[in-house]
Amino acid sequence: MGRRPARCYRQIKGKPYPKSRYCRGVPDPKIRIYDVGMKRKGVDEFPYCVHLVSWEKENVSSEALEAARIACNKYMVKSAGKDAFHLRIRVHPFHVLRINKMLSCAGADRLQTGMRGAFGKALGTCARVAIGQVLLSVRCKDAHGHHAQEALRRAKFKFPGRQKIIVSRKWGFTKFNRADYTKLRQEKRIVPDGVNAKFLSCHGPLANRQPGSAFLSAGAQ
């Protein structure tokens, strides 16, 4: 008996059904890697960011996420280089899909049990996606922005429904706009923290600050 097509589980029905001590025997999801490329590059290295956003409320299978990751990664490595981008999968397949196996071949009518015990057994996993939720994100340099958009366009064919490619106005994966990030970085009010950045607010101990100034000046070391 082959794998049931994912179109049978596309619509979101009922409550989430995650893996737990009551829901055992769940197959491992097909996607195991969620960060691809130069994931250790600092926040200042890749200012450009583009997202693949879902425009429907639906279930996305783990097989589709893995296929999209492979397609996007393959094009970016071929066109921009393996050291020129950071791809991140933004959704995780935590919802468990069930199947009530029914033998439909000839001569199998004596083996079927109909609707007796029809709750079903675990078949696979999927991600429950809302409208406007980000599926994939790519950060890179400005020179490779068109390659990132083309990579997400190719990955879009692996998903059901409608998706949109949106160029972010933020700096990389941070929450700061590009103009604000540059300004705050010059004022030393932002500290790089891996792929993200920490904002230094007015709160906290004042032991290391000069009297009369809440922040250190840009020229101070």
UniProtKB/Swiss-Prot annotation:
Gene3D superfamilies: Ribosomal protein L10e/L16. Transmembrane segments: none annotated. InterPro entries: Ribosomal_uL16, Ribosomal_uL16_CS_euk_arc, Ribosomal_uL16_dom, Ribosomal_uL16_euk_arch, Ribosomal_uL16_sf. GO terms for molecular function: structural constituent of ribosome. CDD domains: Ribosomal_L16_L10e (cd01433). One of its GO terms (biological process) is response to UV-B. GO terms for cellular component: chloroplast envelope; cytoplasm; nucleus; ribonucleoprotein complex; ribosome. Keywords: Ribonucleoprotein, Ribosomal protein. Component of the small ribosomal subunit. Mature ribosomes consist of a small (40S) and a large (60S) subunit. The 40S subunit contains about 33 different proteins and 1 molecule of RNA (18S). The 60S subunit contains about 49 different proteins and 3 molecules of RNA (25S, 5.8S and 5S). Belongs to the universal ribosomal protein uL16 family. This is Large ribosomal subunit protein uL16y. The lineage of its organism: Eukaryota, Viridiplantae, Streptophyta, Embryophyta, Tracheophyta. The gene is RPL10B.
